[in-house]
Every structure is written in structure tokens, then in C-alpha cells.
Amino acid sequence: MNAKKWDVYVYGDVNIDIVIPGVEKFPEPGQEDEVSVMETFVGGGAALFTLGVGKLGLHPVFQGEVGDDCYGELIRNKFRESHVDDSLLVVSKELKTGISLSFTNEKDRSFLTYRGTNEKISIVNVDVEKVKEAAHIHVTGYAGSINHNEYLELLKKIKAETQATVSFDVGWDSTGEWKPEIRDLFPYIDVLFMNETEAEHYGRKESAEEAAREFARTAGMAV
């Protein structure tokens, strides 16, 4: 029987996604257009992973930040409905909850994003003392050379000081560097998540499958 307080500890981004489908063009200045539907969801890779874990019947905790506003309240309610412990979720009095507007049509998508409380995200804020109370930690927000050293230091500390297994969702490298140093992290990762494009870039291989096989030689599992 698992004696840990939480099944999964997640730190990272949470925001509101407002999705507006069927947008073929934007209104001219001074004009107004109507849309048939506009939908609101909880977004952010870390938050979505946490919600998914909660819906599977596990007991996750989420550490992040929202604003003291209606969207922050919506997020907290969604977490509670999905059996997510929000005791580590900070409510900011300074910044508003992040919002991403998604304009979609059959051909493409465009986004407008206000980062809001997600501006404060930094992997150095992960509370290793809290991680000790979890069976597993899910890590997101890697940005290549921008925060590589911080990630390496954290993963080493987690392996040395806790019993938690580690999953790592790499994400897109906004710097465009795709540096091979990411492999330094793999020995400390039990489950490595990458999409096909990310795997091909980081693996410098012709196929994601070939890259995944190579990654799995040092990481526990590449998905």
C-alpha cells in the first residue's frame, strides 16, 4: 500500500484557454463580428496532466499560481472536481490568471496569450520537501539552455533525497537550439515524454521511433 501523501506532485503552468472556432478573418478596425460559439477550458501542460491523473482516480497535488479573480476561482473549482489537491496553489494579489485566446479554422490556428501568473514559473520553486511526500513527480517547462542547469540540479536532488519516480515532458525548445545536453538529464528520468517533432530535433534522427530507441538507452522509458 502506498504510504505517501500524494500519488503525483506536479509543478508548472496553469491558465485559461478560450477557444473561438470558425474564425476565417479578424474584424476590420472599428468593426464587430459575431461567432457561433466560444468555449472556456483550463489549460497549461502541467495543469492538464494533473487533471488527467485526478480523473484516473489517483491523488495528485498541483503547485502553481493563479490570480485572485474569476478565472482563478474557475481553475480551483475544476481541480477540486477532479480530485486534485490545490493546497500548494498560490493565489496572487499582484497578477491576474494567465489567458490564451485560440482562434481556429479548418486550416490553421492563431493565439494571443497573456502569461499573467505563469510569468513567475521557475523550476527552482519546486519544493523537494513536498516531493518527498509524493510517489511520483511530473516535470515540465524545460527551455533548453535557458534553464538546463536548474533542471539538472533539481533532478539530481530528487533522485538523491526522495523515493519519487520522475516523468519529464520536454516540450518545444523556443530557442531553436535543440542542444544535445538534454541527454544529461536522462539518467534521472523514469518516463520521458516527447512528441515526434521534438524527438527528431533532439535525437537528430530521421524518425521519432529511432530517436526514442536511443533515448530509452539512458532514460527509463521514452514515450
Language-model features and meaning:
Residues M1-E65, C70-E81:
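Glycine-rich phosphate/adenosyl-contacting loop at the front of the ribokinase-like
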Residues N2-I16, K78-V91, N105-V223:
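Ribokinase/PfkB-type carbohydrate-kinase core domain
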Residues P29-V37, L74, S100, S122, ...:
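Short, surface-exposed, charged/polar-biased interaction segments
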Residues V42, G64-G67, K93, A143, ...:
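Structured beta->alpha junctions
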Residues L51, I99-F103, S110:
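Short beta-strand scaffold segments in enzyme catalytic cores
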